[in-house]
Amino acid sequence: MLVAACVVSMLASAQILDVVSVNELKGASFQDARVAGISPKGDYVLMTNGSNQGLQRYDLATGEMTVVTNAEGAGFNVQFSQDGKEIVFRERTTGEDKLRYNNIVRANLVEQKQEVIAKKQTNHDMLVAPGNINITLQNSECMMHIVKNGKRIHIAPQGNDVNYIWASLSPNKKKILYYVSEYGCYVCDVDGRNSQFIGEDCRAPQWYNNEIIISMNDQDDGHFTQTSAIMAYTLDGKVQILTSPDMVAMYPFAAEGKVVFSTLQGKTYLLEVK
């Protein structure tokens, strides 16, 4: 644990964001709690559990928690519309052939309506955000594709013999953030060119804005997570630790001015930053 803490300490050398406050969201803290996402406007958080079963909407203004779905698999890779009024999630089902499939569901959180928009999908990661979007990133079967104006383009900046995970499109849709298993985090242009290494321990990365990345730096003993810190990275190489060393802080999500994450103990926290 000491070695891991030293690694984080050495990385955290630059001032990128000012941490204004760190507060537990008690209404969003429960056994096995995990953050599934934060709305683009930062007004609510989606919660799930460690096995990604179900989604609950936690209103940051009122503290009210509302059940969206109890579906299995719903908490993995949730997509938001740009105004945050709609989300797209998966519900895992078993077909008559006894095989496992995903139904893709669109939920209107304002009208509290849901509809299945694709049935019996076998591609675990392929979700398309609702709304009028011309460029969409699809991270499926550890590969990346860009769908631009209806045309699907395969992208492999580090080659085809590696696994791509945690892929996301920058807010301005000009860059792709992704993690290559066993290698680290990278950013490239939407055509797959100009790949830039961000960091080996920049795991579960998320865009904070077009220039800053939020991630976790987790260290384990081969079996269990020992330490984990929420980090900020810039595209020009700066690194900052955002959480205290006594927290095992994991899987962050960010909106402008806010970072949310959960701990191994099921506590959910809101970091307000500027």
Question: Model-flagged regions — what are they?
Answer:
Residues 9-11:
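N-terminal signal peptide c-region/cleavage motif recognized by signal peptidases
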Residues 14-274:
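Sequence signature of WD/YWTD-type beta-propeller architectures
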